[in-house]
Amino acid sequence: MARRNLLIVLVGLLAAAAPSAMAGQTQVAVAANFTAPAKEVAAAFKDKTGDEAVLSFGASGQFYAQIQQGAPYQVFLSADADRPKAAVDAGLAVADSRFTYAIGKLVLWSKSLDVTKGDETLKANAFAKLSIANPKSAPYGAAAIEAMTKLGVYDAIQPKIVQGNSIAQAFEFVDTGNAELGFVALSQLANVTAGSRWLVPAALYAPIRQDAVLLKTGANDEASKGFLAFLKGPEARAIIEKYGYSLE
């Protein structure tokens, strides 16, 4: 009887362990502006499928350089459309997997100044430091320079600019007071009440189309393909919209 009971317990334990043992995992490179929504999407994906999306955050340009060098990412969520396209063109990504998962919005934010009329704040130039993300590796940084150029203030402000390696660091400079104001992604302010902000008019910068792509390293991985499919679905799209992004 004891042996039979032990057998029943073991069978039960094996059955309980089976789903986790079969669960997949995908390595995802995520543009820093998408940090908070990506965490929510990954949690919802795991709840629904049991598969885990392991997220790494940083600047899109830095990720693309790492992918070119053979970094083991399987999915790439960029802050632009150019780098995922380049990955496809270079044979590093699956050709028909690329799609726009979000369209980003640029914001001028300050914890100490009133920037609700951001164009006037920039033209007045009465501040010491303004932060942006590195325009060479972060699309939001390039958008910030484009906006300032169209406003005719870039040349005057340029000596005051401090650059973060990513949009996350640009946010951190303002958050810690190392810059009085800075250009960040609207998504980064979803849960921030401190300070004031100015939503930069869309006419001042090219649309920030954020594309996702399945890398060749994940071409045969079900968790990687499943994560991208989930990202296109209604649950993920609701999360993305909650953080202020537009959708196609």
Model-predicted segments: where are they?
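N-terminal secretory signal peptides that target proteins for export/translocation
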Residues: 1-2
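Bacterial N-terminal signal peptides
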Residues: 5-17
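Exported/periplasmic ABC-transporter solute-binding proteins
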Residues: 23-57, 61-69, 78-81, 85-91, ...
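Short active-site loop at a secondary-structure junction
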Residues: 96
